[in-house]
Swiss-Prot record:
<dbReference type="InterPro" id="IPR029069">
    <property type="entry name" value="HotDog_dom_sf"/>
</dbReference>
<comment type="function">
    <text>Required for optimal enterobactin synthesis. Acts as a proofreading enzyme that prevents EntB misacylation by hydrolyzing the thioester bound existing between EntB and wrongly charged molecules.</text>
</comment>
<feature type="active site" description="Nucleophile or proton acceptor">
    <location>
        <position position="63"/>
    </location>
</feature>
<dbReference type="InterPro" id="IPR026576">
    <property type="entry name" value="Thioesterase_EntH"/>
</dbReference>
<protein>
    <recommendedName>
        <fullName>Proofreading thioesterase EntH</fullName>
        <ecNumber>3.1.2.-</ecNumber>
    </recommendedName>
</protein>
<dbReference type="GO" id="GO:0005829">
    <property type="term" value="C:cytosol"/>
</dbReference>
<comment type="similarity">
    <text>Belongs to the thioesterase PaaI family.</text>
</comment>
<dbReference type="GO" id="GO:0009239">
    <property type="term" value="P:enterobactin biosynthetic process"/>
</dbReference>
<keyword id="KW-0378">Hydrolase</keyword>
<comment type="subunit">
    <text>Homotetramer. Dimer of dimers. Interacts specifically with the aryl carrier protein (ArCP) domain of EntB.</text>
</comment>
<dbReference type="InterPro" id="IPR003736">
    <property type="entry name" value="PAAI_dom"/>
</dbReference>
<dbReference type="GO" id="GO:0061522">
    <property type="term" value="F:1,4-dihydroxy-2-naphthoyl-CoA thioesterase activity"/>
</dbReference>
<dbReference type="InterPro" id="IPR006683">
    <property type="entry name" value="Thioestr_dom"/>
</dbReference>
<dbReference type="Pfam" id="PF03061">
    <property type="entry name" value="4HBT"/>
</dbReference>
<keyword id="KW-0963">Cytoplasm</keyword>
<comment type="pathway">
    <text>Siderophore biosynthesis; enterobactin biosynthesis.</text>
</comment>
Length: 137
């Protein structure tokens, strides 16, 4: 297991109360040895005006996963902030849920890079993101 902080899924989800994460309906669903996953509904909260998943909502899910994964790699007195987010949208999604899968690309003492892939309910890749974070403190 790569994580330096050991939180349960319930504890991870509790951090989202009264935030954008909760408003968008994002829920952490899996914390594996080197992976963090979450789901987000595709509904009125996350649609753009034409009834498709908004690219900004996809980016919010990606940044949520990468930032929390980065936080799990810190020690007491440290936090992480995102410095760069890149998102490539591959497929439109109009309903259901998307699942985000976050894996580390680089875990340095001060800089981290995370790959976050979003899948629709049929398991098709709909968005690929990369998040860079900086460890502070």
């Amino acid at each position: 297991m790569i994580w330096k902080r050991h939180l349960t899924l319930d504890e991870l989800n509790a951090t989202s109360q009264n935030t954008l994460v909760a408003h968008l309906g994002i829920v952490y669903t899996r914390l594996g040895d080197d992976v963090l996953e979450a789901e987000m509904p595709v509904d009125a909260r996350t649609h753009q005006p034409f009834g498709l998943l908004h690219g900004g909502a996809s980016a919010a899910l990606a940044e949520t996963l990468g930032s929390m994964a980065g936080y799990l790699m810190t020690r007491d007195g440290q936090c992480v902030v995102g410095t760069e987010l890149n998102a490539t949208h591959h497929r439109a999604v109009s309903q259901g849920k998307v699942r985000g899968v976050c894996l580390p690309l680089h875990l340095g003492r001060q800089n981290q890079s995370w790959e976050i892939t979003l899948f629709d309910e049929q398991g098709r890749r709909c968005c690929t993101c990369r998040l860079g974070t900086v460890v502070m403190g």
